[in-house]
Amino acid sequence: MNNPDDNDIAAEYLALKAANDELRERGKQWLWNALDVICSEINRELSARNNPPLQVGRQEWQFKVEDSTMVGERFGARFREKTLVVEAGWPREPQHGFVPDRGLARARIGFSQNVMLEAKIIAEFTLKRQRDNDPAWYAIENKKLDARVTEPRLREYFNLILGD
């Protein structure tokens, strides 16, 4: 027999999932927009000094956080032989698990000194819902929530690939 309360629970779940997915997409878009702005600024600076531009690209990607699979995208920026990688995503299916620390999504930054080497993870972020219901990325330091991620903070990671 069909219980009317089951329909209410399903409707509430679907509404919450839709609201969270919208926040996740907004958070991911903020991250990609910030990286695009930073890369444009850096390329203008490099061009003014007659240096080659950053090589950038983005692709669909999956990565593991603890026992969960985050499904999303990976952004890469390369200058000469050094590479900076930014991964962002969240579980899409029940078998993917959940976002640790009650976050909406996770992101990681990796750095490689050589194009032949896998990027080593140097930073992790979690996307959280704010009191005003806007999403914001926060750094995770020693498995604890740290400072909010800003464009200037993201820009600092690019110094790793721009330095000698």
What do these predicted ranges mean?
Residues N2-E60:
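Contiguous, amphipathic alpha-helical segments that mediate oligomerization or scaffolding
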Residues V65-D164:
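Intrinsic disorder/low-complexity polar-acidic segments
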